Amino acid sequence: MPRLRRTEFPTFPYATPYAIQIELMRRVYDAAERSKTLGVFESPTGTGKTLSVLVGALSWVDDRRKARLRGEKLDDEDEDNAVGTKPSDTNEPDWLREYDTKRRKTDADEVERRRGARRAELRARAKAAETRATLKTNAEKRLREKIESTSTTQRAIDPHTAEENEFLVDAYDSGAEGAREDLRALLRDDEEEDDDEDDFSRDEDEALRPAQQIILCSRTHSQLTQVIGELRSTVFGGKVAKAEEQVAAAAIAGRAQLCVNPAVKNLGSAARINERCLEMSKSKTTAKDKAVKACPFLSKRRRALLELKEAALAKPMDIEDLAKLGATRKACPYYAARSALPEADLVLMPYASLLHADTRESLGVRLENAVVIFDEAHNLVDAVYNSYGASVTLEQVRDVLDMLTTYVDRFKTRLSASNLRYLKVLTNLTRAFVTVLQKEIAEVKKSAPEKRLTSLNDFLFECGQDTVNMFSLRRYLKESKVAHKIASYGERVRAGDDASWGGDWDGVGQVKIEAVGGSKLAIAPDPNANPRVSAVHALTSLIDALASADTDGRIIVERDESGTSASVRFILLDAASRFKRVVQQARSVILVGGTLAPIPELVSQLFPELNAATSKTVESSAHALKMFSCGHIIPRDNLLPLAVPVGPTGVSLDFTHGARSNVALIDELGRIVLNASRIAPGGACVFFPSFKYADDVYERW
């Protein structure tokens, strides 16, 4: 069947794109259109790379939508062909082909109509919610001013002693009391809100899910924020009001970045935040009837959560915008972003969230028929290694062993036989790790090496655990969520044993409640004081790594410099073994960066079945590799490289390490920069070999 092609990009936000920008947009467009394509595209920093990638990819999404409206059969519709004929059939009668085209066009029209109505509804409701929030904020301000004014008057008329302030009932004023009641009603968190409202109870309509989804990943959230800024400058990001090309975008991040609940966010470590969030989302009650308080930004806030999701889809938001809006509307940005993900045309997320299979699955990211783009891809191989690395210290495994023993002793009469069996295996494995690491410390007296390398199988044999089925244990830990239970109970026990604290603890004992100035504030304990939650997750990560093939990685057992502690660390050797899951599931994978050279080495690490050294286009049985590298947008006529051997006063410019601290040399460099600035109308940029030398020169100047 014919493929979509595009040579011009009128949606590019600037009048005349550079030739290399047009070429990059074409390459991205073509890689997205050709299913099972691996694109490796190199474009120098400062050439508008991110904008070109966005326009190329989103133009493809828009063209696919328009092709469906024309009734064209696309490559991703073969399996859903209702007529039951093969795409290769050329003997179909004209009336059957005409009917098939008309049916697809009708179906596409209906889907587009529903999707368009849904998008219009989202934008209208987001606008209405924004208006309501503004009115509410203004009303809050006026009511507070009225209450404060009344309170000030009372203080001026009736000065109280400290004793009276403690025991005397507040003076009653009907006006101020009415204002207080209005304020309470206005600020109430809709606790009587019906969780089964029609607005939120409707199931996800698969027909409204985008046919194609672009997943753009970068290393940091700040880089993704820059992508949002570029998107807003295009018609796809809402630069033109009510444009049919506008897409829905969703920025995905972890709880640590999006949590707006101070009692949870103040916990510090990501592991504690995750555990606490899961506890509060369940809103259970203990046997002593001490409720684990539900999160006020999630529980009975379903309408606000829906409105936040709709606002996120209505116009592009980075995670800072989403978190700020969530705090204002008292709705959880993390769960709003997750619920927005299925309906988004463009998904923005950091490397780690997509590369790690379990994280990707927990977020609900579906790679099928999606085009995955990795920006700044020179970091990609390291990101794969980091995502699947694991490390645990002797102190951590001791802590986990203590928690496991306490947990089993407490609940052994209520645990099923299967749970007890797996927990016994986990306990024996943890105890074996403790033994090996203690032995490693004892080797200090024998002058043994501080670090040694071993294979996965040899390490398990050394621990006496080579008969343990790591796959079965890993599956148990993943499906039972027992690690979360053990960590939570361990935190509860730790809180109960903390005799040094005389105040209150919150529901699960993770946060101290301290009275400050008449108010109770949540005070997070030192995350390094007893990091039990992180210890459990560190051990589960190591077990997950030990289920790898023996050739995929190695185990490093090492002591610290003091010889009082030891650790075991898994390092991944074969990035392709993990990255191939993304390649196999996604429609196409595109790597983009300013400097990807040497490209053959990058390809060999991520796509070893392809040989990139021979051609710019490599075909294999399953995938096609497309490579492209362009020059800079600066014309050659605008470049004049000059080597300056001496300065204006004849001082030789010797910037070797031993001579560059010479004061006379630094002064001569200053004269050169001063002269260059006088004749350069746009200013001058000066690059130094190190930050320290730049600071030294700047201080002298």
What does each model-found stretch correspond to?
Residues 2-11, 15, 19, 61-347, ...:
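A substrate-engagement module of RecA-like helicase motors
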Residues 14-33:
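N-terminal pre-P-loop "Q-motif" helix
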Residues 34-39, 212-214, 345, 587, ...:
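Pre-Walker A (Motif I) flank of P-loop NTPase domains
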Residues 49-58, 227-228:
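Motif I (Walker A/P-loop) of helicase-class P-loop NTPases
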Residues 320-344, 355-364, 473, 477-649, ...:
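A contiguous, basic/glycine-rich beta-loop/short-helix subdomain that forms a polymer-engagement track
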Residues 366-399:
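SF2 helicase catalytic motif II
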Residues 581, 651-689:
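Conserved interdomain hinge at the start of the Helicase C-terminal
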Residues 687, 691-701:
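Conserved helicase motor "Helicase C" RecA-like lobe of SF1/SF2 P-loop NTPases
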